[in-house]
Amino acid sequence: MTTFLFLRHAHSQANSGGILAGQLEGIGLSKDGYAQVEKLSSAFKDLRIDRIISSPMQRCLETVGSLAKSKKKRVSIDKRLIEMNYGSWSGEKLSKLSRMKDWKVIQSKPSTFRFPKGESFKELEARIETLLKQLSRKYPKETILLITHGDIVKIAASLTVGSGLDNFQKFAVDPCSLTTISWSAKSRTLISFNQKIVSVKGEKRKTRRSGNTLGGSKDVA
């Protein structure tokens, strides 16, 4: 049985701006995000971690840097943990995207959708499932910290409970939250979901009118 600790990156500049960042380069953490990172080492103090694997995106690497040092672990990069390729939607305001005709399809039938010049949800699900299967076979007794993005965590939770791709948008994942799952060849278990492990004094969230999710949580873009 392999235990996966999914840590969504801390609050980012894109979160602050209500932007769908996707795989755009040069997007780091916000002021709130750096404040969250300062508390991560303490939050993980008593948690066993055998290895750390991260998305290659800047906001993920900034999230895990000091935590990895405190655990004296090297951070490996796996491109399968990268955020979804939202294609031509990348860099756009979520307030604008939520008014587009395709938004309803993304929320209710994501299995049928591919982003223009980007990735399909089926492809995203396939790369995450392949990664988790490979890691659980290779490291059957380890606890692995994965630093990644909102939609990846949501897909992993959906795969674990067997809710199906068309229901994964019902999950919501906050920045710097922890989701814990275990996988083996015979079973999959969701141990905890969207656990708030750090808080920032005075932290404020931007609420989207749609109440739907893309890229993470309902109330943080």
Each language-model region and where it sits:
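Acidic, low-complexity terminal tails and accessory targeting/binding regions
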Residues: 2, 84-95, 137, 142, ...
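Short, hydrophobic/glycine-enriched beta-strand segments
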Residues: 3-9, 147
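Short beta-strand scaffold positions
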Residues: 54-55, 126, 147-148
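A glycine-rich beta-strand to alpha-helix segment
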Residues: 139-153
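Short, active-site-adjacent cap segments at secondary-structure transitions
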Residues: 13, 59-61, 83-84, 152-154
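Phosphate-handling substructures
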Residues: 14, 69-129, 182, 189-192, ...
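Active-site-proximal alpha-helix that buttresses catalytic centers in soluble enzyme cores
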Residues: 11-73, 77
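Active-site signature of alpha/beta-hydrolase-fold catalytic machinery across serine-
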Residues: 66, 155-159
